[in-house]
């Protein structure tokens, strides 16, 4: 058997069927490990031909994931969540890649939320006892991959598979309350894990605990600042702390400048820089920043290792450029940028009204500038 899919689930009747249908023609077996569902999750798994197993929940996502890996018989494993989908792909061509003995793992292109760009994430790896997850929450396969490679070698490849995440809809309150104690335990076990600190800060914010959120952002910023070789995702604490400062009307200019020095290819940081300048009334400086965001997006010269809101690559900087030129009373250029924004988001009433206003104001200025007879 070549290829297995491994899932852990609990009360996923809303998402599971679509997930299993999306991978059924790609893999040879589907392992579903249920950690205590009380809805139709188990029935759906069986209806779709999955091999269903139960696992007592131990407040440890890695333990559940590793149990699923223990049950898989394929030479390769895809790990996927119930609220994710694999987009149609050339299954035969992809499976041919798995026959290459020089590879130990492959990344997929993951869209983490609706309307986001994709980023590479390691989801496919050899079925080997050395390769196991670690981490009570936000479980991580990289330590297992690195252990395998240190003993046996192997390359990391990129696949054509595209996954999209369909979750994060509706009220997340109960999920946040569930994850909060797990994150606290995980950070006691691994206090240097950047992603866990970011998640903790975001949960505190979502639960209205702004002060605790700020403390978490400060803690993780200190961790990142000590890194000799920061990764792309290490920009997230800067973004989180900058947004916290902006929400509380605090000056974030020094922090944004530091962040851009450390992560010059991160478009979200540049966009936030432009917003800060614009809000401070520095419209000419902001124009240069938003033009940089647009040109970088068009040329593809930015950090693709993290996901962005797709609007940040076009309509957001266009609308901010339009606003800057409006504030500078250059209604002609402002109207042109609102028109470009409308071409992307044709249903946006605000852009339509402001474009019309720019046209009227431009005519008014021209009339005032005409010489008297």
Model regions: which residues?
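N-proximal low-complexity "stem/linker" segments adjacent to membrane-targeting elements
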Residues: 1-22
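Conserved donor nucleotide-binding strand/loop of the catalytic core
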Residues: 42-67, 71
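Catalytic-site signature of metal-activated, phosphate-bearing donor transferases
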Residues: 63-69, 75, 80, 86-215, ...
């Amino acid at each position: 058997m070549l290829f297995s899919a491994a899932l852990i689930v609990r009360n996923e009747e809303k998402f599971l069927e679509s997930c299993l249908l999306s991978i059924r023609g790609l893999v040879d077996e589907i392992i579903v490990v249920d950690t205590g569902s009380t809805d139709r999750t188990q029935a759906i798994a069986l209806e779709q031909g999955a091999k269903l197993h139960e696992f007592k929940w131990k407040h440890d996502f890695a333990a559940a994931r590793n149990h699923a890996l223990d049950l898989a018989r394929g030479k390769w494993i895809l790990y996927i969540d119930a609220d994710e989908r694999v987009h149609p792909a050339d299954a035969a061509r992809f499976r041919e890649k798995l026959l290459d003995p020089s590879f130990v793992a492959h990344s997929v292109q993951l869209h983490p939320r609706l309307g986001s760009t994709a980023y590479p994430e390691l989801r496919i790896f050899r079925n080997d006892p050395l390769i196991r997850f670690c981490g009570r929450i936000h479980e991580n396969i990289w330590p297992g991959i690195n252990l395998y490679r240190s003993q046996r070698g192997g390359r990391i490849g990129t696949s054509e598979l595209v996954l999209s995440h369909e979750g994060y809809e509706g009220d997340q309150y109960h999920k946040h309350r569930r994850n909060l104690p797990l994150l606290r335990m995980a950070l006691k076990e691994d206090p240097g894990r950047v992603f866990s600190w970011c998640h903790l800060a975001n949960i505190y914010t979502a639960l209205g605990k702004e002060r605790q959120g700020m403390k978490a952002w400060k803690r993780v910023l200190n961790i990142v600042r000590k890194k000799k070789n920061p990764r792309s995702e290490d920009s997230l604490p800067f973004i989180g702390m900058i947004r916290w400062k902006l929400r509380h009307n605090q000056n974030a200019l020094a922090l944004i400048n530091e962040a851009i020095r450390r992560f010059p290819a991160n478009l979200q940081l540049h966009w936030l820089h432009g917003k800060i300048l614009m809000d401070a009334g520095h419209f000419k400086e902001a124009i240069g920043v938003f033009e940089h965001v647009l040109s970088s997006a068009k040329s593809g010269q930015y950090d693709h290792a993290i996901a962005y809101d797709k609007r940040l690559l076009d309509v957001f900087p266009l609308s901010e450029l339009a606003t800057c030129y409006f504030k500078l009373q250059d209604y002609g250029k402002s109207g042109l940028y609102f028109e470009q924004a409308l071409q992307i988001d044709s249903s946006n009433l605000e852009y339509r009204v402001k474009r019309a206003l720019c046209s009227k104001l431009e005519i008014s200025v021209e009339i005032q500038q005409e010489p008297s007879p």
